Amino acid sequence: MPGPTQTLSPNGENNNDIIQDNGTIIPFRKHTVRGERSYSWGMAVNVYSTSITQETMSRHDIIAWVNDIVSLNYTKVEQLCSGAAYCQFMDMLFPGCISLKKVKFQAKLEHEYIHNFKLLQASFKRMNVDKVIPVEKLVKGRFQDNLDFIQWFKKFYDANYDGKEYDPVEARQGQDAIPPPDPGEQIFNLPKKSHHANSPTAGAAKSSPASKPGSTPSRPSSAKRASSSGSASRSDKDLETQVIQLNEQVHSLKLALEGVEKERDFYFGKLREIELLCQEHGQENDDLVQRLMDVLYASDEHEGHPEEPEAEEQVHEQQPQQQEEY
């Protein structure tokens, strides 16, 4: 796909305007708020084919391709669940469609992954990409879901990349792109240690000096043997009690985590339904629909509450009225 070319001003200098293949000139546009350059690239080329062909890359090849294009150090397909790589791909294909300053390249938690995918969804909408992003599946870090999406994105990249140079490190403006942790690692799986290694008698057995040949070892008295065996049994019981308590605590935490995840998925589904309704009625130029879309796609905590000052003013206005009633 040939890319746009830049025209020259009458004095022969580059004026950063863009001329398309059909001769239409698109003037250079600049965001006055953030001072970022944004070019109008038109609509993206949508890709609908998801069938496996000879061009489909293996998981090792596709991770090597991702690392090579955007200078990352991913080792597994599952690490694409953070969404950061896709955000940088969109900045590479369509400069100005996404702000990399808001992308969390060091994301480690699921809500940070969702934040990145919200930015990706907004860039898809801005470039009229029809692909539905299965966010609730991708952020789980499952291999097959992430492999299917990156294979589709590779075809989307091939259909829209025009061969222009791009420096991913410079585009991130110094942000360290740390790979997310392996989703397969469970925080509850602690390394198992043998009970013999943790027993208080194990260290004593190892540290006891070897008896010299020919010398008769002295036998400990019955009182010492009884005291040592009693202390060892008490230590074993204490350790067993502690293990039981920790297992109960882990079980309760797992139940709490499952409940939170179900609640999150429930509200995420509601927000997704609201988003689809807003997109269906987005062409009607309804102010309420636009305000809802702004709240849904807000990437900053403060951007999602633009009406809080007005609410405070209404409270202050109602207080004198209540005093007059008394």
Curated annotation (Swiss-Prot):
Q: Name one GO molecular function term.
A: microtubule plus-end binding
| Entry keywords, A to Z | Cell cycle, Cell division, Cytoplasm, Cytoskeleton, Microtubule, Mitosis, Phosphoprotein, Ubl conjugation
Q: Name one GO cellular component term.
A: microtubule organizing center
Q: Any idea which residues bear Phosphotyrosine here?
A: 166
Subcellular localization(s) per the UniProt record: Cytoplasm; Cytoplasm, Cytoskeleton
Give the Basic and acidic residues compositional bias ranges: 299-316
Bias regions of kind Low complexity — which residues?
A: 199-233, 317-326
Record flagged with keyword Phosphoprotein: yes
**What is one GO biological process annotated to this record?**
regulation of microtubule polymerization or depolymerization
Q: Which residues form the Calponin-homology (CH) domain?
A: 56-158
| Summary of the function given for this chain in its UniProt record | Adapter protein that is involved in microtubule polymerization, and spindle function by stabilizing microtubules and anchoring them at centrosomes. Therefore, ensures mitotic progression and genome stability. Acts as a central regulator of microtubule reorganization in apico-basal epithelial differentiation. Plays a role during oocyte meiosis by regulating microtubule dynamics. Participates in neurite growth by interacting with plexin B3/PLXNB3 and microtubule reorganization during apico-basal epithelial differentiation.
> What is this protein's record name?
Microtubule-associated protein RP/EB family member 2
